[in-house]
Amino acid sequence: MTKQLETLLIGGAGKTGRRVETRLRARGVPVRVASRSAETRFDWADESTWEPALGEARAVYITFYPDLAVPWAAERVGKLARLATERGAERLVLLSGRGEHQVWPAERAVREAGAAFTIVRCAFFCQNFSEGALVDGILQGELAFPAGDVREPFVDAEDIADVVAAALTDERHAGRIYDLTGPRLMSFGDAVTEISRLSGRSVRYTPVSGEAYREMLAPFLPAEQASFLVELFGMLLDGHNSLLTDGVERALGRKPRDFSEYARDAASVWR
């Protein structure tokens, strides 16, 4: 059953959040976006912002910054989930990672908060190539990244947003955990070849070591953050996630979008 609840999107300016907002507004759902820079201010590092941001929200989409795998994520996510439930939230949807045992405590905290919950675990976003840290390398003609030849089932943020919007508005998704992937396994080299073909830009993929990637990040990120990213990518892209799931189809009743569909839509970014 579909039910329109006042909805809060934490991190609503991100890759999935802004797409979820578009879908909810199109359905007439009352929605607020909360982030460090939004009109509704929310900062994971400043608990004084949490209660005012929650307001009268009855459904909450939770995305954690910097990543749900960091050691302090579970404590903060759990505290926020319990506070939301105490204030009357009926539905919590958590964006999580696929194949990351570090995120399980945060997932458990949401499941045990007392509200209906949905956990959305995602593979590597397609949009990281066009809206994230990888786009600069593509525009420069070489994507250097520590992924070797591992094959990943890249998932489109459009599919993620469709699943999240459904979970926030339809009680049939309560209690579900969805593992979302795209419909095929591709190496990062395959992805770059597809991007090159559809955009007309000459791009090559160069696999690099974790240490080399850390050195590449050094001018742009604090050492601790760079080390965390290298460790995270090493964990996620070691091959254990090289399998497809039916999460999109289970949630939406349709097949997930293929990487080529995403790349065709995003091609103007790389031209």
Predicted regions and their residues:
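Oxidoreductase cofactor-interface core, primarily capturing Rossmann-like NAD(P)-dependent enzymes
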Residues: T2-S37, A45-S48, G55-R58, D67-P71, ...
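A hydrophobic C-terminal alpha-helical subdomain
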Residues: A13, E211-R271
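Conserved Rossmann-like nucleotide-binding pocket used by diverse enzymes
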Residues: T40
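Periplasmic-binding protein-like
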Residues: Y61-T63
